[in-house]
Amino acid sequence: MDTELLKTFLEVSRTRHFGRAAEALYLTQSAVSFRIRQLENQLGVNLFTRHRNNIRLTTAGEKLLPYAETLMNTWQAARKEVAHTSRHNEFSIGASASLWECMLNAWLGRLYQLQEPQSGLQFEARIAQRQSLVKQLHERQLDLLITTEAPKMDEFSSQLLGHFTLALYCSSPARKKSELNYLRLEWGPDFQQHETGLIAADKVPVLTTSSAELARQQLSALNGCSWLPVNWANEKGGLHTVADSATLSRPLYAIWLQNSDRYSLICDLLKTDVLDEQ
């Protein structure tokens, strides 16, 4: 049996709502419904009764619940044990390309400088979309996630690392938004809410990317503008803020599993300020 089906079943039974379960699992609601149907087809029974927003476990669902919890706990324990024996002194940190380029690269350098030579700690820097990294964190395939969005799942712990400032930049001075093409740099799903109020609704991006460096290099060629971290843009030089634009403050969070066996190490690493250069 696919453990993802059981995990979805447990989340729906916990929230009693397909939409909230989908949000917690970072899936679409249709994907959650499909997984539940798959599980019901495999078992040959209905697991939930569905009446509008009133979702309840059937008798069969109630009977499955303790077994599903036991199976998932056993599976997680097995994954943890196998991962522990294979990883030794490896520690994995995940973030988007832009965060690595603009601030985490410098932080990683400081971590290496502060490590005791005999510690033998090896870092793995992973670059991926937030949704993929959250899944890896949940499945114990990732130790620490750095992101601009607070966690939505109860089993995650987090620490607010601070804030950094974004500004709208272009490659030449005294330019207005209406004169420039828009290059969308992905700063997280919730950033789109702010973006809507700061960029004209009919402004279709000529480029969408998760790399700040790529966006910066394309500003001149595409006659474009993009939201970039102020300190990083100042370090790079040759960039100018768009005349009729504002600045925007963004939070930065460290996220890990509540019961992570790397908790002590995480606390030690986070003593080194991630935003020290920001």
Curated annotation (Swiss-Prot):
Gene Ontology terms: biological process: negative regulation of DNA-templated transcription
Alphabetical UniProt keywords: DNA-binding, Repressor, Transcription, Transcription regulation
Feature: DNA-binding region: 18-37
Entries under InterPro entries matching the protein: LTTR, LysR_subst-bd, Tscrpt_reg_HTH_HdfR, Tscrpt_reg_HTH_LysR, WH-like_DNA-bd_sf, WH_DNA-bd_sf
Record-annotated membrane-spanning stretches: none
GO molecular function annotations of the record: DNA binding; DNA-binding transcription factor activity
HTH lysR-type domain span: 1-58
Matching Pfam families: HTH_1, LysR_substrate
Top-level taxon in the UniProt lineage: Bacteria
Family: Belongs to the LysR transcriptional regulatory family.
Database matches in PANTHER family: HTH-TYPE TRANSCRIPTIONAL REGULATOR HDFR (PTHR30579:SF8), TRANSCRIPTIONAL REGULATOR (PTHR30579)
UniProt function note: Negatively regulates the transcription of the flagellar master operon flhDC by binding to the upstream region of the operon.
Protein name: HTH-type transcriptional regulator HdfR
Organism name: Salmonella dublin (strain CT_02021853)
Gene coding for it: hdfR
